[in-house]
């Protein structure tokens, strides 16, 4: 007879999922990086699989930054961008992820000298192939690298408005939150233009900084969802506002531990966020680099936070409701979640 642990694990594996907070470069698995490393053998990444797996094992945040930058240096052509998307889609489809909003930082591709129309073509082709071959729908969020200030904002907006992929649904900002205040007006202007063009405002906020960054995302950027948002609990007024509006929060527990935002899973605020009645979704952020997966995040929610089937299914439904899936797509995924009982 299966134990409760094996039963919940099987339930999580079978659970239809939606991923809202995952970065393209940070999602590159070892097989995908190995393909890129062999394509560009002059890069800083080992071309031996065993050495690459050792290089990929998470140690600390500085090492994560080194791995991330090393992988980024291998993304040199539109073909490389398409290879990344295809690899991420394959990994997610294997976890029963039906839909993903994949965060792309086009400004880094611009700085690498890639022709932006060709990058868009690669994104479109990879999304179509993922849907046709794997049954997973891939949408995109274009993300300003906040540390590049006004130049990053203008470059990201330019690509979003002039060369948008077919499945571009959102406009975001990531990077080092502490770098944002001097460029606040440029970011506000870029988000206003993106919203006017029909893109959803989906910024990171409240991960590395306090509630003030979340307030700025809400009031200055018109946020419809918040990436991370874990510091909201430090401001009772903000908690009340988020509870009243049910604005979705993209929570990434393993990432928060790995980046040092919380000491360990026992200290993670997700259980309290749920107790406060906040609208929480589970996400993986940079999964291979943090030794996790979206399925793994649901297991963390069960094992570390004590959530049962009904609560896990509720988190899965939240992700569907917070997504940019069309009405029929939402109904289909929710029906499959409900069918698990």
Spans of model-derived segments:
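Catalytic glutamate of the conserved HExxH
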Residues: 205
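Metal-cofactor-binding active-site regions of metalloenzymes
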Residues: 1-199, 208-213, 220, 224-225, ...
């Amino acid at each position: 007879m299966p134990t409760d642990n094996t039963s919940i694990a099987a339930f999580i594996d079978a659970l239809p999922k939606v991923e809202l907070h995952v970065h393209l470069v940070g999602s590159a698995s070892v097989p995908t990086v190995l393909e890129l490393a062999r394509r560009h053998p002059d890069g800083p990444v080992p071309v031996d699989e065993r050495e690459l797996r050792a290089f990929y094992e998470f140690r600390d945040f500085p090492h994560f930054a080194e791995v991330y930058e090393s992988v980024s240096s291998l993304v040199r052509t539109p073909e490389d961008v398409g290879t990344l998307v295809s690899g991420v889609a394959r990994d997610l489809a294997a976890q029963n992820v039906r839909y993903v909003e994949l965060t792309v930082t086009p400004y880094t591709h611009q700085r690498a000298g890639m022709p932006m129309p060709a990058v868009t073509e690669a994104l479109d082709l990879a999304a179509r192939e993922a849907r046709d071959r794997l049954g997973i729908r891939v949408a995109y969020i274009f993300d300003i690298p906040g540390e590049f200030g006004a130049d990053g904002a203008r470059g990201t907006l330019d690509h979003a408005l002039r060369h948008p992929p077919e499945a571009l649904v959102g406009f975001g900002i990531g990077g080092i939150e502490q770098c944002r205040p001097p460029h606040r007006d440029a970011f506000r202007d870029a988000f206003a233009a993106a919203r006017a063009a029909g893109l959803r405002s989906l910024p990171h906020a409240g991960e590395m900084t306090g509630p003030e960054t979340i307030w700025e995302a809400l009031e200055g950027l018109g946020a419809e969802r918040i990436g991370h948002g874990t510091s909201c609990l430090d401001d009772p007024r903000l908690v009340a506002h988020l509870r009243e509006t049910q604005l979705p929060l993209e929570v990434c527990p393993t990432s928060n531990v790995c980046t040092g935002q919380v000491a360990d899973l026992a200290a993670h605020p997700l259980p309290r966020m749920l107790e406060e009645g906040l609208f929480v979704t589970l996400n993986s952020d940079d999964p291979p680099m943090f030794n996790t997966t979206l399925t793994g995040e649901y297991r963390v929610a069960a094992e570390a936070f004590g959530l049962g089937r009904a609560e896990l299914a509720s988190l899965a439904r939240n992700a569907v409701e917070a997504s940019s899936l069309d009405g029929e797509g939402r109904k289909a995924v929710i029906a499959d979640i409900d069918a698990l009982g």
